[in-house]
Amino acid sequence: FRNGYQELYETLAEKSGADIYIDAFVSSISRGGEGFRIKGGEDTVYDHIILAVPAPTAALLLKEIAPEAAEKLQTVQLANSAVVGMRFASDEGLPENSGVLVANGAEDVKAKAFTLSSRKWPHLAERGGALVRASFGRFGDNIALTATEDDLVDWALDDLKTVTGFDGREAGLEEIYVQRWFGGLPRFDEHHLDTVAAVRSLLDDVAGISITGAWASGVGVPAVVADARVVAKQLL
């Protein structure tokens, strides 16, 4: 995707032919005749619903029509994260590998990973300079919630030099972008697969309601898309 993931979701939206409502608040799902009523900006009844939302959100929406499944979903915990995107004038000294993962507990390093984007994707390298993405936030810490943008950028530059030897300040920092993801990463504990199986088994008794998402399938676009396709086909 030469212009980012927006190419993917814009193409999917166009190809779907569906009516898509953006910023449409939904407060609850209840029985409505032979279907399900979605309460929000409009009270609308649907034959089938696929919930593609984080587990805690699904728990809130299902508490009336599937309380046991909702209770199971409440056990899925989430982690917050923050991403710092940086563009440098020069890529001299940047390692040739695609990225770096930082072990939990590493001393004097707050970042958990770096993606050396201009090394990983050739079309980004064509733009010149260097593009690097630093990731922060692990389960149980609050960096993504409490750190200022200035702190995140400083840590990203410091940690990048510590981990790779690349001095971003000397390379010429030209652009910065900070994105926070609140509750964006589900925590997969040793009981997680059993939880997913239990939720889906309980929802089998509620004909017309299905569920998908990163908490159920695993993080990453390929895993999420594959699971969503399976769920969608079950409704056909």
Q: Where are the model-predicted features located?
A:
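Short beta-strand to alpha-helix junction loop
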Residues: 1-13, 21, 145-152
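Generic solvent-exposed, charged/amphipathic alpha-helical segments
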Residues: 9-14, 63-66, 153-161
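A conserved beta-strand/loop element that lines the FAD pocket in flavoprotein oxidoreductases
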Residues: 15-27
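Short, well-ordered alpha-helix to beta-strand connector turns
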Residues: 16, 46-47, 206
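A structural signal for the hydrophobic beta-strands that form the central parallel beta-sheet
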Residues: 20-22, 51, 211
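Mid-domain catalytic core of redox enzymes
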Residues: 24-146, 150, 163
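Conserved flavin/dinucleotide-binding core of flavoenzymes
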Residues: 114-236
